[in-house]
A protein has these predicted regions:
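Formylglycine-dependent
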Residues: 1-45, 52-61, 81, 230, ...
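Substrate-binding rim/cap in mid-to-C-terminal beta-strand-loop elements of soluble/periplasmic
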Residues: 4, 8-18, 92-100, 126-184, ...
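C-terminal, low-complexity/hydrophilic appendages and adjacent surface loops
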Residues: 138-142, 208-275
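A structural signal for well-ordered alpha-helical segments within the folded catalytic domains
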Residues: 28-32, 78, 85-89, 164-171, ...
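Core domains of carbohydrate- and sulfate-ester-processing enzymes
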Residues: 1-16, 56-62, 120-144, 221-247, ...
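Short, solvent-exposed turn/loop segments enriched in Gly/Ser/Thr/Pro and often Arg
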Residues: 49-60, 111-117, 186, 209-211, ...
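Structural recognition of the beta-strand scaffold that forms the well-ordered cores
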Residues: 47-51, 108-112, 146-148, 165, ...
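Active-site regions of oxyanion-processing enzymes, predominantly non-cytosolic
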Residues: 26-68, 95, 99-108, 139, ...
């Protein structure tokens, strides 16, 4: 088997291993590539994963989108809204193509994000009413849109309220392809739950871990722990990050840490830390998390990206 050399310019645009010169707005370019892929494969089963760069930094737009938001006085917010508009148009363009080819009744469409709005873009977007941002385990960092559409198969206009995770898309896609009995420890087929064929919740617990900081939640409660930072803003570089030690940041919490417990049903904005008043919940969730964490393989790649954040009045270290 012939192996190709590593990409010479990782931030360039490639088709397979060949660099492509792109002059147009990248969102539009990716959209047209996706439409072409659908047209080419319309007579056979296909899987299309379209991972748009927008609205990631750097914040950039073009006139056909920005003119829709001339009424916004803040430049960053105007550009960000324009980028979201380009994303919205992309989804519409792809859905329209599926409909025009008569594929919408046989195609599962999923729209999702990887994280919430980033705090470092200074007010261009908001996660309100949720707290936290990208890189955080607060709801503002991990609670994202998840939209599923499948004409004449999934119910329209329904809101599914049980906690799920994007890992579930793996088993869901496999089931949609005809292997409904397939499942893994981490991934659950969501189709029978969304169709209300199953009354239980897909998960008893959901877990997040990024270096030492972690979170675990059940249907009601959410527990988080962060290491208290032995650093200040003066230790941050020009990129807003801490310089990692040799070998990377530790994978375990420091001896000085904060514990946060929130009742997400009563307090989805995570404003009232109930850790001290509900020690039994803290203990239960801690035990569940530690059992899960002990089953994981040790990280192969050192953690080198880190910054500081103020959470519940304490400066903590985020690792991402």
């Amino acid at each position: 088997m012939t192996q190709r050399a590593p990409l010479k310019r990782p931030n360039a645009v490639y088709r397979n291993f060949d660099e492509v010169k792109v002059d147009d707005y990248l969102t539009d370019v990716f959209t047209e590539e996706a439409v072409h892929f659908i047209q080419k494969n319309q007579h056979r089963p296909f899987f299309l994963f379209l991972s748009h760069i927008t609205p990631h930094t750097p914040l950039q737009t073009i006139e056909k989108y920005s003119r829709r938001y001339e009424h916004l006085s803040d430049k960053r917010a105007r550009i960000y809204a324009s980028m979201v508009a380009s994303l919205d148009d992309s989804v519409g363009r792809i859905v329209k193509e599926l409909e025009s080819l008569g594929l919408s009744e046989n195609t599962l469409i999923v729209f999702a994000s990887d994280n919430g709005c980033a705090g470092y873009i200074e007010g261009a977007c908001s996660n309100a009413p949720y707290s936290g941002f990208k890189r955080y385990h607060q709801e503002g960092g991990i609670r994202i849109p998840l939209i599923m559409s499948w004409d004449n198969f999934l119910p329209r206009g329904q809101t599914y309220k049980q906690p799920v995770i994007t890992l579930d898309l793996y088993s869901t896609f496999v089931a949609a392809a005809g292997h409904a009995g397939f499942s893994t420890i981490d991934s659950v087929n969501l189709i029978p739950f969304v169709k209300e064929e199953v009354n239980s919740s897909p998960h008893k617990y959901l877990y997040w871990r990024s270096g030492p900081p972690y979170a675990i939640r059940d249907e009601r409660w959410k527990l988080m722990r962060y290491s208290v930072a032995p650093y200040t803003a003066r230790d941050l570089g020009n990129d807003g990050r801490l310089t990692p030690p040799k070998g990377g940041w530790p994978h375990e919490l420091s001896s000085e840490k904060i514990t946060l417990l929130y009742d997400l049903k009563a307090d989805p904005s995570e404003q009232n830390n109930l850790a001290d008043s509900h020690p039994e919940v803290v203990k239960r969730l801690t035990t569940e998390y530690e059992t899960w964490a002990s089953s994981l393989a040790k990280p192969m790649i050192p953690a080198i990206r880190s910054t500081l954040a103020d959470i519940d009045g304490t400066t903590v270290q985020l690792i991402f």
